[in-house]
Amino acid sequence: MSIKNDKWIRRMAEQHKMIEPFAPHLVSRCDERSIISYGTSSYGYDVRCADEFKIFTNINSAIVDPKQFDSKSFVDVQSDVCIIPPNSFALARTIEYFRIPRDVLTICLGKSTYARCGIIVNVTPLEPEWEGHVTLEFSNTTPLPAKIYAHEGVAQLLFLQADDVCETSYKDRKGKYQGQTGVTLPRA
């Protein structure tokens, strides 16, 4: 299994629509101001966060149960920024829509800019032949409110190509998050 470089990422995005919309180079400025970078890097792709957020709240004193998740545990926010309460979390989604090839596994890592502020991003691997918007989870590990910026880089995806094609892909087994759009809550 090998990690794929910028040339491969560009080719797959342009010829196979692996990433849409796609930035072929790293973008770190917009309208003459610095932003948290997004786009193609040496061995990965830095994704952007859309302006749709679900901020966790405990106003209903609900129990968090992944098998019976109560959507009332979130407050929906549409904004260029998301303020995550102390020791809480928020869900968001990527601007980019992904179509992962059958012989590729994609791993997501947080960006150091956010990690150095105590904001951790978590995404499970994007499996072979999965497609959709990536649902992002941001944990604020600090005792202070934390800010996430929409339309800027929030995480990096690494593409690992297998030596052999898998026998059963995510699409083959009809994975429950296949083709997801928007911020997707847990499904049991």
UniProtKB/Swiss-Prot annotation:
Residue sites binding dCTP per the record: K111, S112, T113, Y114, A115, R116, T135, L136, E137, Q156, Y170, Q180
UniProt-listed Enzyme Commission number(s): 3.5.4.13
Molecular-function GO term, any one: dCTP deaminase activity
InterPro entries named in the record: dCTP_deaminase, dUTPase-like_sf, dUTPase_trimeric
Disulfide bonds: none
Keyword list, A-Z: Hydrolase, Nucleotide metabolism, Nucleotide-binding
Protein's UniProt keywords contain Hydrolase: yes
Catalytic activity from the UniProt record: dCTP + H2O + H(+) = dUTP + NH4(+)
Domain of life of the source: Bacteria
Active site (UniProt): E137
GO biological process: dUMP biosynthetic process; dUTP biosynthetic process; nucleobase-containing small molecule interconversion
Pathway(s) this gene product operates in, as recorded in its UniProt entry: Pyrimidine metabolism; dUMP biosynthesis; dUMP from dCTP (dUTP route): step 1/2
HAMAP family: dCTP_deaminase (MF_00146)
Its job: Catalyzes the deamination of dCTP to dUTP.
Family statement drawn from the similarity comment of this UniProt entry: Belongs to the dCTP deaminase family.
Subunit structure comment from the entry: Homotrimer.
Protein name: dCTP deaminase
Species in which this protein is naturally found: Dichelobacter nodosus (strain VCS1703A)
